[in-house]
Amino acid sequence: MEAIKDFFGSLLLTELFKGLRLTGKYFFKRKVTLRYPMEKTPTSARFRGLHALRRYPNGEERCIACKLCEAVCPALAITIESEQRDDGTRRTTRYDIDLTKCIFCGFCEESCPVDSIVETHIHEYHGEKRGDLYFTKDMLLAVGDRYEAEIARRRAEDAPYR
């Protein structure tokens, strides 16, 4: 009896029509997929993307070379070298982040006592070779200078929750 039922089921293509009915059901509904390059998904104020080094309003870089971000980084993606200034303060001579190692956990941003290193909202970056994802101090400062207004706005939005 079961064999006869299977024979007529395959002869009448019932599985095919069940699938077509399901396809037809969703074919005319509103699409939920975003067309990515033209339509962007909104990100939260706490989104962790590309890193940036910030400056004070007078143009001096904020990093005081305390190396807390280097120590707290679980992926060992941050490398810092510093030197002593004439006035006794330390400043960085080298600040590198290897984005191929970085896991974007945000520990570096949380540990920074002067809000020097931040993770921006930028997630659309790429590299054609491995060295393109190795950010130096000058590159990080350039990102910070370019997006300072956006960084400050997002940090102000997030301030009540910190």
From Swiss-Prot:
Highest taxon listed in the record's lineage: Bacteria
Amino acids binding [4Fe-4S] cluster 1: C63, C66, C69, C112
Membrane topology category: Peripheral membrane protein
Xref: InterPro entries: 4Fe4S_Fe-S-bd (IPR017896), 4Fe4S_Fe_S_CS (IPR017900), NADH_quinone_OxRdtase_chainI (IPR010226)
Cofactor dependency: [4Fe-4S] cluster
Domain 4Fe-4S ferredoxin-type: 53-83, 93-122
Gene Ontology terms for molecular function: 4 iron, 4 sulfur cluster binding; iron ion binding; NADH:ubiquinone reductase (non-electrogenic) activity; quinone binding
Main location, first listed in the record: membrane
PROSITE patterns named among the record's database cross-references: 4FE4S_FER_1, 4FE4S_FER_2
Cellular localization per UniProt: Cell inner membrane
Binding site for [4Fe-4S] cluster 2: C73, C102, C105, C108
Family, as annotated: Belongs to the complex I 23 kDa subunit family.
Role this protein plays: NDH-1 shuttles electrons from NADH, via FMN and iron-sulfur (Fe-S) centers, to quinones in the respiratory chain. The immediate electron acceptor for the enzyme in this species is believed to be ubiquinone. Couples the redox reaction to proton translocation (for every two electrons transferred, four hydrogen ions are translocated across the cytoplasmic membrane), and thus conserves the redox energy in a proton gradient.
Protein known as: NADH-quinone oxidoreductase subunit I
